[in-house]
Amino acid sequence: MNNTSTMIEFTGKFWTYFTLVFMMLIIGFFFVITSLVAAILNKLCDLNDHHTNSLDIRTGLRNDTQSITRAHV
């Protein structure tokens, strides 16, 4: 009977390609993580600007109301 086992030889060429593929996967992983963090921070900044603007509008209206009340007194 013939022995039909498969042998993988770990030559210098194999390690070169393995390292290249591994580095590409790591760079892609960091790109995805960086994109997600940037999107989350962008969304948080948009929400913060909205709250800040609405607070400024309320404060401005409150100050206008107080100045109108003082003018009538």
Swiss-Prot record:
Residues 41-73 are virion surface. Residues 1-19 are intravirion. Its main location: virion. Changing residue 7 to I: In strain: ATCC 51908. It is found in: Virion membrane; Host cell membrane; Host Golgi apparatus membrane; Host endoplasmic reticulum membrane. It is a single-pass type II membrane protein. Four species of SH have been detected in infected cell cytoplasm: a 7.5 kDa non-glycosylated form (SH0), a 13-15 kDa form that contains one or two N-linked carbohydrate side chains of the high-mannose type (SHg), a 21-30 kDa polylactosaminoglycan-modified form of the protein (SHp), and the isoform generated by alternative translational initiation. Of these different forms, SH0 is by far the most abundant protein detected during virus infection. Tyrosine phosphorylated. GO terms for biological process: proton transmembrane transport. Glycans are attached at residue 63. InterPro entries: SHP. Keywords: Glycoprotein, Host cell membrane, Host endoplasmic reticulum, Host Golgi apparatus, Host membrane, Hydrogen ion transport, Ion transport, Membrane, Phosphoprotein, Signal-anchor, Transmembrane, Transmembrane helix, Transport, Virion. GO terms for cellular component: host cell endoplasmic reticulum membrane; host cell Golgi membrane; host cell plasma membrane; membrane; virion membrane. Changing residue 67 to L: In strain: ATCC 51908. It comes from the Viruses. The chain crosses the membrane at residues 20-40. The keyword Metal-binding does not apply. It holds the Pfam family SHP. Channel activity is inhibited by copper. Also inhibited by small-molecule pyronin B. Belongs to the orthopneumovirus small hydrophobic protein family. Homopentamer forming a funnel-like pore. Interacts with glycoprotein G; this interaction occurs on the surface of virion particles and infected cells. Interacts with host BCAP31 (via C-terminus); this interaction is direct. Viroporin that forms a homopentameric ion channel displaying low ion selectivity. May play a role in virus morphogenesis and pathogenicity at various stages of the viral life cycle. Accumulates at the membrane of the Golgi apparatus in infected cells and may facilitate virus release by modifying the secretory pathway. May enhance host membrane permeability and disrupt cellular ion homeostasis, which can be sensed as damage-associated molecular patterns/danger signals, triggering NLRP3 inflammasome activation and inflammatory immune response. This is Small hydrophobic protein. The lineage of its organism: Viruses, Riboviria, Orthornavirae, Negarnaviricota, Haploviricotina. The gene is SH.
